[in-house]
């Protein structure tokens, strides 16, 4: 079955459910796309809004009925964040856009929220929210000590300032986010986004313990893992007992490095008010560490780059 026929079949089932809800006959004509022509365009738009942005774009290329309905704000208002009006107020570029244009603008460019302490954008295919928590919004051990860390601007960063590690023995970073800020019923991955300076030491073959979980809940040992900021770690180090769970960093398209610190499932919903905490800690190797620049912690749906 071709993708187009699959989409027709998918929508045939949706239309039948909608017609039943609207007390319309579900037995007239064929059971294909043709029966959509019997429905008002607004109703077709509502139907499309219960799918995904990717499906909506495919359907727009399938038939004129879909193409017209997909242009409606009814469709795209369902895909953009509920607080889109406050997002618009923070950016002049968004002010005069249609809902569809706003959706794709938020896919292509992140917008600062929470007084510039977080960055929000949406994933183009499924409208899932992605968030980066800035270093300013993280709890960094000795972060207020000018001998240990300093806060500097970086033209390649999304935020006004980033955190440069000058020198510490205890390396600890903690970040929190409310589950309501991200998409419900979604598995997320969390990443530390950073750069290494030319003079960087103290992280060679050093395993940093990381954990991601819900605040107030006991974390299972399986939630814990180890990362290494040094991408040139040697094989002997990797073969150690905990080396099998050791995560290496990867280079991003924007020039920064990222390293995965864990995953979690966001149940979400109006009654769910969990705080998700992400921790990176290295306190066992009591030697000086220097030369990282931390932009923040990025949270995005698992398997999305």
Curated annotation (Swiss-Prot):
Gene3D superfamilies: 1.20.1280.50. SMART domains: FBOX. Residues 33-79 form the F-box domain. Coiled coil: none annotated. Pfam families: F-box, PP2. CDD domains: F-box_AtSKIP3-like. GO terms for molecular function: carbohydrate binding. This is Putative F-box protein PP2-B8. The gene is PP2B8.
């Amino acid at each position: 079955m071709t993708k187009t026929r699959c989409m027709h079949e998918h929508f045939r089932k949706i239309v039948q459910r909608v017609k039943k809800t609207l007390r319309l006959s579900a037995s007239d004509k064929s059971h294909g796309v043709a029966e959509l022509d019997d429905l008002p365009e607004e109703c077709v738009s509502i139907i499309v809004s219960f799918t995904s942005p990717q499906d909506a774009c495919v359907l727009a290329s399938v038939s004129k009925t879909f193409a017209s309905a997909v242009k409606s704000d009814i469709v795209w208002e369902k895909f953009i964040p509920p607080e889109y009006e406050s997002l618009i107020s923070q950016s002049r570029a968004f002010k005069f856009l249609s809902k569809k244009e706003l959706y794709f603008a938020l896919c292509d460019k992140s917008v600062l929220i929470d007084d510039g302490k977080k960055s929000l954008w949406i994933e183009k295919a499924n409208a899932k929210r992605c968030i980066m928590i800035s270093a300013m919004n993280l709890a960094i051990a000795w972060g207020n000590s000018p001998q240990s860390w300093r806060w500097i601007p970086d033209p390649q960063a999304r935020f006004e300032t980033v955190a440069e590690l000058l020198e510490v023995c205890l390396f600890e970073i903690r970040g929190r986010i409310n589950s309501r800020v991200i998409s419900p019923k979604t598995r997320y991955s969390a990443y530390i986004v950073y750069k290494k300076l030319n003079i960087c030491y103290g992280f060679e073959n050093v395993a940093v313990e990381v954990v991601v979980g819900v605040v107030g809940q006991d974390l299972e040992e399986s939630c814990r893992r180890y990362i290494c900021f040094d991408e040139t770690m040697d094989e002997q180090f990797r073969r150690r007992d905990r080396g099998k769970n050791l995560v290496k960093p990867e280079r991003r398209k924007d020039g920064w490095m990222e390293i995965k610190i864990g995953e979690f499932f966001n149940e979400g919903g109006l009654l769910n008010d969990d705080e998700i905490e992400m921790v990176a800690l290295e306190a066992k190797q009591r030697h000086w560490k220097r030369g990282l620049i931390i932009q923040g912690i990025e949270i995005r749906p698992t398997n999305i780059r």
